[in-house]
Structures are given as structure tokens and as C-alpha cells.
Amino acid sequence: MGQIRSKSGLAIALSRLKGFERPKVSVEQYTMDSEIGAFVLWQATLKGDIAQKVSADLGCGTGILGIGCLLLGASKAYFVDNDEHALKIAKENLKIVKSEFLIEGKASFLCNDILGF
């Protein structure tokens, strides 16, 4: 099992995740670019805001930010979206990552509007 040791390593891991096949324009669904996700998460990591912390990926879509948090050592990540199909993709993406990397944190998937979280 591998570990993430750099921002570029994180970007590569995130680039392997599945995106939306048919994004719903009405709810502004899109897949976050892996480089942007890696940049944001790496900045938070450098500030000590991810390792051993609980994260919430609100409006998670395909789960790139929550999965990135788990890759960087978050103790738990909540994945919240009001679209069951998006959560299904996020769960599949987590399985992909777990097959390659050691993930010790827990994941919780919630189908809910973020206002109800």
C-alpha cells in the first residue's frame, strides 16, 4: 500500500477517480480538477488542518475532496450530497483509492441536502 508524500502524488491519485458521466447542469454538478483539489488540500495539510481531523465534503459530488482528506490522514470524512448517483460514484472512488493506498480514516456517506447536515 502506498502513501501520499507530495502535492503531485496527491494530484495523481485524485486524477484516477471517476467523474460524472452526465452531470446535472440544473444543480451545477461538475467534477473538480485533480490539480485544483490537490492544491487546496495540500495547503490545508501544511497548516495542520487535515491529519487526525474530521472533514465534511459538503456537496461532495464524486468525492474528490473527502477522499483527498482521507488520503492525507483525516480520521473521518463525511460525504454529503443530495444525489444518490453522485454518492454511488464517490463510494466507488473510495474503493479505487483503498485498493492502492492505506486509508485509516472512516468514511460516512449521507444523502441529504447540506442544509440538513
Q: What does each model-identified segment do?
A:
Residues 1-54, 89-117:
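S-adenosyl-L-methionine
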Residues 53-61:
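Conserved class I S-adenosyl-L-methionine
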Residues 62-74:
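Conserved SAM-binding loop of SAM-dependent methyltransferases across substrates and taxa
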